[in-house]
From Swiss-Prot:
One Pfam family of this chain: GRIP
Family: Belongs to the ATG23 family.
Protein name: Autophagy-related protein 23
Compartment annotation: Cytoplasm; Preautophagosomal structure membrane
Cited InterPro entries: Golgi-autophagy_related, GRIP_dom
Biased composition, class Low complexity, residue ranges: 19-37, 496-522, 651-661
UniProt keyword Cytoplasm present: yes
Membrane topology: Peripheral membrane protein
The protein's assembly and partners: Forms a complex with ATG9 and ATG27.
Biased composition (Basic and acidic residues): 7-18, 225-247, 261-273, 373-385, 475-494, 728-767, 786-815, 935-945, 977-1011
Principal location: cytoplasm
Parts forming coiled coils: 142-170, 215-259, 323-495, 566-1067
């Protein structure tokens, strides 16, 4: 359309230019008279004005209008030749002056853009002739000499002078538009899917899509910016917390540097106090009752310096009656048992290290953040080595260090979360940009995401298997701990029941056995590691320290206060027993809760599998969520490595500090406290009664604990069975997912079949309409051909046969329509069934979501159990080191005992004989019972007094029981600590799960948005494809109708020719017959016109382009179109549709 408009404008402009050109060329002789007047009137102001006008008009991209006018020069017969009009010399001079001085008095729309002198001259001539027309009036004689034709043309030129600038301006505007359209269309083709400016609706749709994309991008950017601001706030808060922790660490360091000085002064004071206690027999501590001394042992305010000194005194006093060979076998047995436990723990640690090797590879980024913590731990370890003598201060420092480590771990976790969230949001922004840039490559990206989803599924399966393995290892460790507890209880049961105390007959000095010292040393070492856990622990930990015995001459002073203090001690012990029972009950409830959670593990796995399938089927754009899941898994592995490294470092530091402190304190205190041990033996004999009662109560508590553990074992077995059943259910879930995929494929096939059936039905309906139209056309043709059929019966039979065929086709079409409708009615219940299956799958998805949540909780519980077992391994290693240090101290004490025995043999022959008998009896009993250290004391006491030997035996047995009870109490407290840690970690994992749920909700919202956009695009594509298919079907139907109409036309033409030949042959008939035939033939033309009118009216009134296109072949039949004519009509119909 635009090209036609342009060509029309160009045509009119060319005609006008040709007229003006002829007029200017005819008026070229009159220029002589006008030059003089123009020469005088061309002022400089006017020249400047003409130049400005020329510069304004020269902005158009056209060539010079002079060139334009020269292009449209037309050779006219009325034009005078240039040779016949010679210029006079004045005119020639004026022409030269005009060319040299510039152009004056030019029209507004004339531009001197041409650089050639000849072109400018010709343009000046033409324009001067046009502008100086009024100046020719005074030259009347020259005008009279002109011919009337020239005058007429001049008058016409004067009329055209007003219209010429407007035409030139309109031409320039049109030319600008025509030249601007080409680069605009080129830019459209390069940057948009459009090809020309003839389709504004497509351009509007494209711009709307671009605006939608920009809006989506802006929304995502707003979300990301808000998330970024929140993360920045969290990061700043975490930095502030880290700074506060650093300041606290600096304060701790400064305090640790001040403490060694105070420790030296305190050790000197303690040594002086020990000497004074040895010299002054009337010390107030020595006058205390035996029960009060026992309660002092068990008190949490017990000082380590006193306990070590008293242990050394008991060792030296006991060494007077023991031999070195008697103690070695029992120590070897203890060392062998400890070594076996160490090997078991090492094997467990190796298994754990194998599981965490992969996690350590990913923890390289955390090394820098942990270096500060390790340096601080090393410094605190150095400080602990300096402060061996002050165990109480070291315990406080260990508490501070552990609290600081926990704070550091929390800060590091927060920092990791912030960094991971920041990375996730940056990844979101990048992925959004990539998705906007690569919208055309959506299909390839979707395939890649499917592969990623399958990889994520495999990773999740591996994580589940790892969790199961960890749970099994934890169960094995728990069973090992249970076996240990049962062994300890068996040992306690195998010990003989404590007998009643017999009064001491002889005033012989009695001493405590080395086992007591070892027990106290073990308790002191254990307190260093678990001081934070054992503040509420009573009675057994420091059994020897606070009680300072009276002199050897006063073994028993006041029996009545003993009874009162004994009852008070029993009450406190009962309170401790009640506390232990409550803790055991809490553990039982916790085990029940964990078992209930474990029972729903099968449902959780089903939910996880269904979620993964939903991610594969629907969430093809879940790349962000998968990256976040991977980051969380990496974070878990990093946290595991951090926990293991910190535990190892803490255990190594505490164990080294404890070992060194014990060795040094024992070596220094043995020499100074030997004399004090002799005096304390008498008070220890009185304390035996209270210790026996305490041992009985603790034995009962141990039996109750053993029953509780036996009850917990069947629950563990049930958990193992549930894990086995979970594997079977996992396989069943896989089969179900396959069946689901098959069902979805069937659903898609059924939908395709329904669409095909609908298309077939629509095609059949169009065929029926076309057949009906054909029936109407054929009925009209039948009316027209009735007269011809009267002449020829064959034509009538043929038409009837065609009518029967057409009716048969219509019946067939109706039958096919009915069959298609029946197929649709059959397919609808199938579609309903598939929709019900989809609802069921959605419900299963919700159930699987709940199962996944519960699975995360179980995973957090398993992590807590793992960490608690690691703590147990660290404590067992510490206990092993303590046992080694005890063995060394016992060896030294045995050497001291031998030396003392040799000195005592020199005192008298009677004592030598008694000691020889004691040694012989001791050798005999060592061969019989190597594991008992009481044999040597029994032989010595049989010589002195049978009552003394019984007392010493009981003291040994009580000390062993005390140590075992201490170990059991440690284990109970470790279990309570593990419970607290489990609760804390459960809270943390709940928080983490909530964060994950929020992230998943965001990801699901984003996927829903992407899904809606994808569905909209798909629906648009389906609609466009349907339109294309409909158009193609219509074209095929039209072609088929054309072919059928041609065939019918050929048949009819043949019949008409046959009828005409018959009419020519029957020319011998009468005029009446001819008149009748003419009258009968004349109405045949009348229906043709009426039918043509009705079809044209239908064609013009029809708004549907499809039906209008179907009427084209009917018109072609009536008007006898060719193929080219039909194509032209089809194009015209389509052009009307575009408009």
């Amino acid at each position: 359309m635009f090209q036609r408009f342009k060509s029309a404008i160009d045509r009119t402009i060319a005609e006008e230019q040709a007229r003006q050109q002829t007029a200017t060329q005819s008026r070229s002789p009159s220029r002589t008279g006008s030059t003089s007047s123009r020469k005088g009137d061309g002022t400089p102001g006017q020249r400047v004005k003409s130049r400005k006008q020329a510069s304004d008009a020269g902005d158009a991209p056209n060539p010079d209008p002079a060139v334009f006018e020269a292009a449209f020069v037309i050779d006219d017969s009325d034009e005078p030749s240039r040779a016949a009009t010679p210029l006079p010399p004045n005119a020639a001079d004026e022409k030269k002056s005009d060319n040299t001085n510039g152009q004056g008095n030019m029209p507004e729309d004339k531009t001197p853009e041409g650089q050639g002198a000849n072109d400018e001259g010709s343009a000046d001539k033409a324009q001067d002739g046009a502008t100086d027309a009024p100046a020719t009036k005074p030259q009347a004689p020259k005008l009279q000499e002109m011919s009337p034709e020239i005058r007429q043309k001049l008058r016409k030129l004067e009329k055209l002078e007003a219209t010429y600038p407007e035409l030139l301006r309109s031409y320039r505007v049109a030319h600008r538009r025509a030249t601007a359209i080409e680069p605009f269309e080129k830019a459209l083709r390069e940057n948009t899917p459009l090809t020309s400016i003839s389709d504004p609706e497509a351009l509007v749709e494209y711009l709307n899509q671009v605006n939608l994309r920009s809006d989506m991008v802006m929304q995502e950017l707003k979300k990301v910016s808000t998330d970024k601001d929140e993360l920045q706030k969290k990061y700043n808060e975490a930095e502030e917390k880290a700074k506060k922790l650093e300041e606290e660490l600096v304060a701790v360091r400064s305090a640790s540097t001040d403490q060694p000085k105070t420790s030296d002064s305190e050790t000197s004071k303690d040594a002086q106090d020990g000497k004074n206690g040895a010299t002054s027999p009337e010390d107030p501590e020595k006058s205390k009752s035996p029960v009060s001394s026992v309660m002092g042992m068990f008190s949490p305010k017990h000082k380590p310096q006193k306990s070590l000194g008293e242990v050394a005194e008991t060792k030296e006093s006991n060494e007077e009656f023991f031999s070195y060979d008697d103690e070695i076998p029992q120590l070897q047995a203890d060392v062998a048992s400890k070594s076996e436990e160490i090997e078991k723990l090492k094997s467990e640690v190796e298994d754990l290290q194998k599981e965490l090797t992969t996690a350590r590879e990913t923890s390289t980024g955390l090394v820098e953040s942990l270096e500060n913590a390790t340096r601080e731990l090393s410094k605190t370890r150095d400080v602990a080595s300096v402060k061996d003598s002050l165990q109480a201060q070291l315990d406080d420092r260990n508490k501070e260090i552990t609290s600081l480590n926990q704070r550091l771990e929390e800060v590091q976790k927060q920092l990791k979360q912030l960094e991971e969230d920041k990375n996730a949001h940056t990844a979101k922004v990048d992925e959004l940009e990539v998705s906007l840039a690569s919208s055309d490559k959506r299909t390839s990206e979707l395939d890649a995401e499917l592969a990623k989803a399958s990889n994520a599924k495999n990773i999740s399966k591996k994580l589940i298997d790892d969790l199961n393995n960890q749970i099994e290892t934890l169960k094995n460790e728990k069973s090992d701990s249970q076996t240990k507890i049962t062994d300890l209880t068996k040992k306690l049961e195998s010990k003989p029941a404590p007998a009643m105390l017999t009064p001491a007959a002889t005033p012989m000095p009695t001493v405590l056995q080395p086992a007591a010292t070892s027990a106290t040393a073990a308790s002191g070492g254990g307190k260093k590691k678990n001081n934070k856990k054992k503040k509420g622990k009573g009675g057994v930990g420091g059994a020897v320290a606070p009680s300072q015995a009276p002199t050897a001459g006063d073994p028993v002073e006041t029996p009545e206060p003993v009874i009162t203090t004994d009852t008070a001690g029993n009450a406190e012990l009962k309170a401790e027993i009640v506390k232990l029972k409550e803790e055991v009950a809490e553990k039982d409830t916790q085990i029940d809760r964990l078992s209930k959670r474990r029972k729903t593990e099968e449902d959780l796995r089903e939910e996880i599998e269904s979620l993964q399938e939903n991610i594969l089927m629907i969430g093809q754009d879940h790349v962000e969520a998968k990256d976040k899941i991977k980051e969380l898994e990496a974070e878990k592995l990093e946290l595991k490595t951090q926990i293991t490294d910190l535990e190892k470092k803490i255990s190594s530091s505490t164990s080294d500090a404890e070992a060194s402190s014990k060795m040094q304190s024992e070596m220094e205190s043995i020499k100074t406290e030997y004399s004090d041990l002799k005096e304390k033996t008498s008070t220890l004999q009185a304390d035996l009664g209270a210790a026996q009662q305490l041992a009985q109560n603790r034995f009962k508590d141990l039996t109750e604990l053993r029953e509780v553990l036996q009850k917990a074992q069947p629950e563990l077995k049930s958990l193992r069975q549930e894990s086995a059943t979970l594997k079977a259910t996992k396989e069943e879930l896989a089969n179900k997912t396959k069946e689901l995929r098959d069902m979805e494929k069937r659903e898609k096939d059924l939908k395709r079949d329904v669409e095909r059936a609908q298309k077939i039905s629509s095609d059949r309906e169009t065929e029926i309409k076309s057949l009906q139209e054909k029936l109407t056309v054929e009925t009209n043709a039948k009316l027209r051909l009735e007269d011809a059929q009267r002449v020829s019966g064959r034509d009538l039979r043929r038409s009837e046969a065609e009518k029967v065929e057409i009716s048969g086709r219509a019946d067939k079409a109706e039958q096919e329509l009915q069959s298609v409708q029946e197929e649709l009615s059959k397919l609808r219940p199938k579609v309903k069934e598939l929709e019900e299956q989809m609802h069921k799958l959605k419900r299963e998805k919700a159930a699987s979501q709940e199962e996944a949540d519960f699975k995360t909780q179980q995973y957090s519980n398993a992590q807590g159990l793992l960490s608690s077992m690691r703590d147990q391994t660290a404590e067992m290693s510490v206990q092993l080191k303590e046992s080694k240090s005890q063995a060394e101290s016992l060896e030294e004490e045995l050497a001291e005992v031998q030396r003392l025995l040799q000195e005592r043999t020199r005192e008298g022959e009677t004592m030598r004989r008694l000691l020889a008998d004691v040694d012989e009896r001791a050798d005999n009993k060592v061969r019989d019972m190597r594991a008992r250290m009481e044999a040597a004391v029994e032989e010595r006491d049989r010589i002195e007094d049978e009552s003394a030997t019984l007392a010493r035996r009981k003291t040994r047995e009580t000390e062993d029981l005390k140590q075992k009870l201490k170990d059991l109490e440690r284990e109970v407290k470790t279990l309570t600590h593990e419970r607290d840690e489990l609760e804390q970690r459960e809270k943390e994992w709940r928080k983490r799960r909530e964060e994950l749920e929020s992230v998943e909700e965001k990801a699901e919202a984003e996927t829903d948005e992407l899904r809606t956009t994808a569905s909209q695009l798909r629906t648009a594509l389906d609609a466009s494809e349907k339109q294309v298919r409909d158009v193609e079907k219509q074209r095929a139907e039209l072609r088929r109708m054309l072919e059928e109409s041609r065939q019918r036309y050929e048949k009819l033409s043949k019949d008409l020719k046959a009828a005409q030949t018959k009419l020519v042959a029957s020319s011998s008939r009468s005029s009446f017959d001819s008149v009748r035939s003419g009258s009968n033939g004349s109405p045949a033309g009348a229906p043709d016109t009426v039918y043509l009118k009705t079809i044209l009216l239908q064609f013009l009134e029809q708004k549907d382009t499809k039906l209008r296109a179907q009427l084209v072949p009917v018109l072609g039949k009536l008007l006898r179109f060719d193929k080219t004519d039909e194509q032209k009509w089809q194009k015209a119909v389509q052009h009307i549709e575009v408009k």
